[in-house]
């Protein structure tokens, strides 16, 4: 295809084009074409029917393509900018790290590059044509024009007059440009829903012109003075053009199909002689004629008669532009554009091609080329600032966002420091920081907000760590220490105060939040014992503790303290056995009123050791317990018993004692039994290493704790408790109303001796045996034990209450029934329970004391509590469970804090009603009964352990 115009890349002008341009002299009008494009050549000249010479043309950012049609006075400068889609796509592909792509920065960079190219066009062109692919005006252009005006007035006009002083044209004016360029807008696409008539198209163009004019006037882009106006708009001339008829970017395939269709649809007027010969062969007239409408005849197209056809013919971009070119050639370019005109000769400058090239070369070098040259040096300070800070000066959005973020940063810091305490921990710091960030977000916006938010966090963190950081050592109740981290302090303190009772329960005191196990389970109660009038008088059970033999004693290593948790297969089996201990105990005891454990060693071998190993091969036999009717027991054990059974023997506990196989005399036998128990009273305890935590079923039996975490005390005789009044305030303080009663528990016991041992009993003396039966046995060898028990819970506010079942708080005498005690004795009792003093379910009370009032009977009550918390089963740590004396009020105080091998077992935050045992529980079956030793004195013996001659009730 032969083109009737010249096309070249600046500054490589062809000789033919240069020669023809020289003929024009100073009648040369330079038109700059900028804007958007969507084709692969970045061609915005399609409306003027121009395109690059080569079909393989590759557009480059910053490249200027020149077009000139001989016979005209118009030189087109086609600027290729980042706003062309093909160039924009290349810039996106050049991004090195797509994952860290910053859209705001990329947009600012492309916009600044477009402004740089448009700045050059403002100074070297008479007319600017902005090409828009959309159907409406782009509002971002207003911002572009504002930035252009800022760059020209605040930067270019500071250095350009001095740098261009050597050019002769500069002496004609001080504006450093040929004129105030006239801006025209070319829209390549017309709205599809609008009619394509002269009236509709003109109305749409006029409406767009009014909107653009108001915007440019409102933002001072166009003013009354040419010296202060960035652009010019024509007066009473159209400056908006919509391409309504021509398809500037057609689909080539559709064009080929349409051409083929038109070639087939020929009229009779256009038929050639060859076509007539073919028509003669047709069987009838119109055989090969197409159906449908015929195209409009060429005569009609060549000779339009109506106004619409003429408007369609004249409504082209070329005609639209030439009207403004003629204004430039007639020296009336600024006539009517500005109310305040400039002096004659300074309004408009037309140059010949050589002078214009010199002008273009200098401005291109100043505005474009030197910017890309990083080694360029200049003595002009203003120009140096332009080269270095051009992008920064245009990024007004970033400055705006930074300003907002600075305001938000100050507000956030002020909010953080406003209510900060003297010392505070991580939780308080996080809370204050969250409030500071919320205060920052009220002002801070935009892309820099994330970095400023991180800066705010760093400033607040530094402020916190600058002498205000809290110790934050957690207490055993998970409360942080409030002391300063850097300041020396001998003792941690969380500032939390609890109210707890002493060992005997008579006196309540304020206790600080404990940080060590010794403070929690021992030191507080030792302190309370000094100020309590009852604690100093009561008789305490002495639990075994570590007694060092050297001065450099130490805590046992973890593997040594808990051997069952490490090692090979035997230890693994032991772990499996221990893991199922709690579950087996629960299955054996839960919900039963009958005694569930036959022997001492059968279900306590994981808590206090196996009696077979303790006795080291001794032949002391364990008691046998049988259940059922009294008749069956008599037939098996005492065939010579002639007494009749009472009607309440169904729930009797039958304890059968088997005497030793050989005995010289009664006294020697008793002495031998007592000696065996004492000799089996413990393992070879370590005197150099102690147990660091609480004793549990996995603990090494040879290791003892440094201090007792349990307390067992006889607070007085059984007469101090009255079931009519309950526990009085002067005796047990802090109980809630109605929850201060113990539960009566009747236990029926029948003692049975083997036949082979009857002769042995007769030798003990008839007088002693008769006193035993008369004073203590009713109905022969049957006796009823009247026991009072109470499971006391205590919250951190000092409120105490008893439970009548695992799910119910005792509410007074009405809740006490005949079988109420069985609900607490034969069922697992929760370690934690919601305190009724508050409505919040997460305010928990803890099982702290077991009250036992022993009966006046020739038996001793045995205590063997086992507390299951998590995977641990905690015990008293004694070789044999303690024996309680008769007719006395005993109180067992449980540990305040439970600690496992390597972790703290804290109370749960909240208990669910359907899983009240999730926080831990006291295993059922903690009570046992044993016959009083024959040589026991009337005074209670606290250090006498229970032998194998007892049964669990």
From Swiss-Prot:
Keywords: Nonsense-mediated mRNA decay
Family of this protein: Belongs to the SMG8 family.
Biased amino acid composition, Acidic residues: 621-637
Name of the molecule in the record: Nonsense-mediated mRNA decay factor SMG8
InterPro entries named among the record's database cross-references: SMG8-like (IPR019354)
Function: Involved in nonsense-mediated decay (NMD) of mRNAs containing premature stop codons. Probable component of kinase complex containing nonC and recruited to stalled ribosomes.
Presence of the UniProt keyword Zinc in the record: no
GO annotation terms (biological process): nuclear-transcribed mRNA catabolic process, nonsense-mediated decay
Pfam family, one: Smg8_Smg9
Species of the source: Drosophila willistoni
Region (Disordered): 621-649
Biased composition (Low complexity): 638-649
């Amino acid at each position: 295809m032969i083109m009737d115009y010249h096309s070249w890349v600046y500054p490589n002008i062809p000789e033919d084009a240069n020669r023809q341009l020289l003929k024009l002299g100073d009648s040369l009008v330079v038109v700059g074409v900028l804007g958007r494009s969507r084709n692969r050549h970045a061609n915005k000249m399609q409306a003027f029917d121009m395109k690059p010479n080569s079909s393989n043309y590759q557009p480059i950012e910053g490249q200027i393509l020149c077009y000139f049609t001989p016979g005209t006075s118009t030189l087109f400068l086609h600027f290729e900018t980042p706003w062309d889609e093909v160039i924009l796509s290349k810039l996106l592909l050049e991004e090195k790290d797509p994952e860290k792509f910053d859209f705001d920065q990329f947009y600012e960079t492309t916009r600044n590059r477009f402004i740089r190219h448009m700045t050059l066009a403002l100074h070297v062109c008479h007319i600017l044509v902005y090409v828009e692919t959309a159907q409406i005006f782009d509002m971002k252009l207003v911002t572009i024009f504002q930035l252009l005006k800022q760059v020209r007035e605040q930067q270019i006009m500071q250095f350009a007059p001095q740098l261009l002083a050597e050019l002769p044209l500069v002496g004609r004016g001080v504006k450093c440009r040929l004129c105030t360029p006239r801006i025209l807008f070319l829209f390549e696409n017309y709205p599809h829903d609008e009619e394509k008539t002269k009236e509709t198209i003109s109305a749409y163009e006029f409406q767009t012109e009014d909107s653009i004019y108001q915007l440019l006037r409102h933002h001072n882009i166009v003013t009354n003075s040419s010296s202060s106006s960035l652009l010019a708009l024509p007066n009473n001339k159209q400056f908006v053009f919509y391409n309504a008829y021509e398809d500037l970017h057609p689909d080539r395939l559709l064009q080929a199909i349409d051409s083929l269709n038109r070639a087939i649809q020929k009229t009779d007027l256009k038929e050639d002689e060859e076509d007539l010969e073919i028509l003669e062969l047709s069987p009838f007239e119109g055989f090969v004629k197409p159906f449908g409408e015929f195209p409009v005849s060429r005569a009609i197209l060549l000779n339009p008669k109506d106004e619409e056809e003429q408007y369609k013919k004249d409504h082209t971009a070329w005609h639209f532009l030439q009207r403004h070119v003629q204004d430039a050639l007639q020296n009336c370019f600024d006539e009517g554009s500005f109310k305040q005109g400039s002096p004659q000769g300074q309004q408009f400058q037309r140059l010949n091609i050589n002078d214009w090239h010199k002008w273009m070369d200098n401005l291109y070098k100043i505005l474009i080329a030197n910017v890309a040259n990083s080694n360029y040096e200049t003595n002009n300070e203003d120009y140096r600032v332009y080269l270095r800070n051009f992008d920064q000066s245009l990024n007004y959005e970033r400055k705006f966002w930074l300003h907002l973020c600075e305001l938000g940063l100050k507000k956030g810091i002020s909010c953080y420091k406003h209510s900060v305490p003297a010392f505070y921990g991580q939780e308080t710091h996080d809370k204050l920081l969250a409030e500071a960030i919320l205060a920052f977000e009220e002002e801070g916006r935009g892309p820099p907000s994330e970095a400023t938010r991180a800066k705010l966090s760093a400033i607040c963190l530094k402020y916190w760590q600058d002498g205000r950081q809290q110790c934050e050592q957690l207490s055993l109740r998970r409360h942080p220490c409030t002391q300063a981290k850097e300041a020396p302090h001998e003792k941690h303190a969380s500032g939390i105060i609890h109210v707890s009772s002493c060992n005997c329960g008579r006196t309540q005191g304020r206790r600080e939040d404990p940080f060590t196990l010794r403070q929690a389970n021992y030191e507080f109660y030792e302190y309370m014992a000094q100020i309590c009038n009852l604690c100093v008088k009561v008789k305490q059970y002495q639990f075994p503790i570590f007694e060092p033999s050297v001065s450099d004693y130490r805590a046992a290593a973890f593997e040594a303290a808990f051997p069952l948790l490490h090692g090979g297969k035997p230890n693994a089996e032991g772990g499996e056995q221990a893991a199922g201990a709690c579950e087996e105990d629960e299955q054996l005891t839960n919900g039963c009123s009958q005694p569930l454990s036959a022997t001492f060693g059968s279900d306590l071998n994981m808590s206090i050791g196996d009696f077979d190993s303790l006795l080291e091969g001794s032949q002391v036999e364990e008691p046998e317990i049988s259940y059922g009717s009294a008749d069956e027991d008599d037939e098996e054990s005492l065939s010579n018993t002639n007494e009749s059974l009472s009607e309440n023997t169904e729930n009797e506990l039958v304890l059968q004692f088997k005497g030793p196989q050989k005995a010289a005399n009664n006294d020697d036998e008793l002495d031998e039994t007592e000696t065996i128990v004492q000799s089996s009273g413990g393992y070879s305890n370590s005197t150099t290493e102690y147990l660091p935590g609480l004793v549990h079923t996995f603990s090494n039996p040879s290791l003892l704790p440094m201090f007792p975490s349990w307390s067992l005390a006889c607070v007085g005789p059984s007469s101090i408790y009255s079931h009519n009044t309950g526990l009085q305030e002067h005796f047990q303080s802090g109980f809630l109303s109605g929850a201060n009663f113990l539960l009566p528990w009747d236990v029926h016991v029948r003692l049975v001796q083997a036949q082979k041992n009857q002769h042995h009993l007769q030798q003990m003396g008839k007088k002693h045996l008769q006193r035993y039966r008369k004073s203590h046995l009713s109905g022969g060898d049957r006796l009823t034990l009247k026991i009072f028990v109470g499971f006391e819970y205590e919250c951190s506010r000092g409120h105490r209450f008893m439970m009548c079942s695992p799910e119910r708080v005792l509410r007074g005498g009405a809740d006490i029934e005949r079988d109420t005690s069985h609900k607490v004795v034969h069922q697992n009792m929760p370690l934690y329970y919601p305190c009724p003093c508050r409505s919040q379910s997460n305010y928990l009370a803890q099982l702290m004391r077991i009250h036992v009032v022993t009966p006046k009977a020739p038996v001793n009550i045995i205590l063997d509590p086992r507390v299951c918390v998590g995977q641990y089963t905690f015990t008293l740590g004694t070789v044999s469970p303690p024996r309680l004396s008769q007719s006395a009020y005993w109180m067992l105080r449980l540990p305040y804090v439970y600690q496992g091998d390597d972790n703290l077992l804290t109370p749960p935050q909240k208990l669910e009603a359907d899983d009240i045992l999730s926080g831990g529980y006291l295993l059922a079956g903690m009570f046992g009964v044993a016959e009083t030793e024959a040589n026991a004195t009337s005074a209670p013996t606290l250090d006498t352990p229970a032998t194998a001659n007892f049964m669990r009730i």
